[in-house]
Amino acid sequence: GAPAIVFGTNPENGMFFVGTKSVFNKRQVKINYTYDDIAKNHQGNVADILRLCLRYLPHIDGIVQADWIGVGGGSVYRPNTLEYKFATPINQQIILAPHTSYTEVSPDAEAKIGVTIQSTNYCRFIDTMDAEIKRPNLLKDVAEIAALIPFCKVSDNKYARSYCRQLVNKFIRMGKIPNAEFMHNILEAKYKGEVNVTTFKVWHKLFQLKQRLLDAIVVNGNVECYIDGEPTRHEGFVTVSTNPYKLVDRLTFSKANFNLSKNW
């Protein structure tokens, strides 16, 4: 969903607020306690969404980040790349998917993944904790990656690293990833010595490993997902742990996100 909504009670003054991730800015913090604050800090659709949030969100004690899904009354929503289809129409005024909590409003605020909030008469909170992983046997995959790493050349050149990322993203936009040899062969001459074919082989192996993990995830909820009318799975998953890790189906969703026109 989008945009990201941050809301809750600021422990510094005990006041309820709403905002986007700009509440965590180092400079020009945009935190909204009133409708006047929203008018001063935001404009357009984001301002309209924040006004609805200020009116209808419950005044919780903590601080939560959620994805905006939409205004109630329907059963199909497309806040961003994905289109969500609910089994029955949503009766509440607004719909959000909470996923992260904080203890303070600060640029250094520590994020804790995993939030469940009870829906109210005015706000429907989507359960983002309704997935589990059926642990696959990945020992062979890990062993193959470990065997390649000693022969993998990693560049200290930040420009070379950035260039390689851009190259990978270029192919993801196209929805196709060529083999490691091809990717190394098309590098600009000045970067070819910064990495080797094994570098891309390791990337390929890690990509395949993440895909296997994604295939092992089971979603228990009944929300259906679509991209351009075609059924698809959820965009990504984050492990609930002290060291959270995000898994995203890059070929499907990163490609769609790269080519997305925001509708908010």
PLM region spans:
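Core nucleotide-handling region used for phosphoryl-transfer chemistry
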Residues: 3, 8-264
